[in-house]
């Protein structure tokens, strides 16, 4: 069974508790369970992970090559300044789609810039947890072509 790796970055372990008016009430565990079921219904496996540590995220991106058909990445605040994560994305051959629960472009100005998005297949922002499902569909469609 093909695998899609889902990587969530810093503070996403606080989903459901942290600013629910922005990020929603669904917990990270709820999100992971939802994505696992979503993938299985389409004949795929979702490998869901979360870390508050940049090095873990980099290691997982590297690990995705050879193990996964694609990566869904929510780098959290690392989006705005982690050239190390950007370089990790650029170093692998599997497609990466960046996802953000909130519309980062409608928030504080420092959130408007993504150093990681230019090396991804695409970016989905502001659609809540459905954004992850849309990213998965995009990766699965890419597999069919």
Curated annotation (Swiss-Prot):
Catalytic activity annotation: 3-dehydroquinate = 3-dehydroshikimate + H2O
One Pfam family, short name: DHquinase_II
The protein's annotated pathway: Metabolic intermediate biosynthesis; chorismate biosynthesis; chorismate from D-erythrose 4-phosphate and phosphoenolpyruvate: step 3/7
GO biological process: amino acid biosynthetic process; aromatic amino acid family biosynthetic process; chorismate biosynthetic process; quinate catabolic process
Site (Transition state stabilizer): 18
Active-site feature positions: 23 (proton acceptor), 100 (proton donor)
Amino-acid biosynthesis found in the keyword field: yes
EC id: 4.2.1.10
Residues engaged in binding substrate: 74, 80, 87, 101-102, 111
Single GO MF annotation: 3-dehydroquinate dehydratase activity
Record's function text: Catalyzes a trans-dehydration via an enolate intermediate.
NCBIfam families named in the record: aroQ, PRK05395.1-2, PRK05395.1-3, PRK05395.1-4
Protein name: 3-dehydroquinate dehydratase
Protein's organism: Halalkalibacterium halodurans (strain ATCC BAA-125 / DSM 18197 / FERM 7344 / JCM 9153 / C-125)
